[in-house]
């Protein structure tokens, strides 16, 4: 559990990661998986998109967090399209801008969109990208919880919620 990225880039070049860090992590993860039937979660903040194929190769099962406020992870539909079920996704709900500043309706839209993008075909644990801070209005936390509880069950049935939110944002943009 080491952060590999910042808001806009990696903390090291992909070549340095592949030469120095990846082999060590691969050995460690292979050893862990030889001892138990477990899923490995990699916690790394930041813009880690350039390393996701590498993380999959070293037996990472779940990326934590899907930090949608960083470069490369904003488009969760493209993320799921590219990596599909080779990776599980944990997070996706932004606590830097969305949760502190959005309306309840905007939070509902974001939650519905993330469930739709990352949850199709399974493999998604919906949650805030990080801790819920004191700057986040309680009604936005409740909106996240309520929508996740209502629509975050399989099989996903979000069509009505997404249609309602699309028309809401078309009228208020």
What are these regions (language model features)?
Residues 1-173:
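Active-site loop segments of alpha/beta catalytic cores
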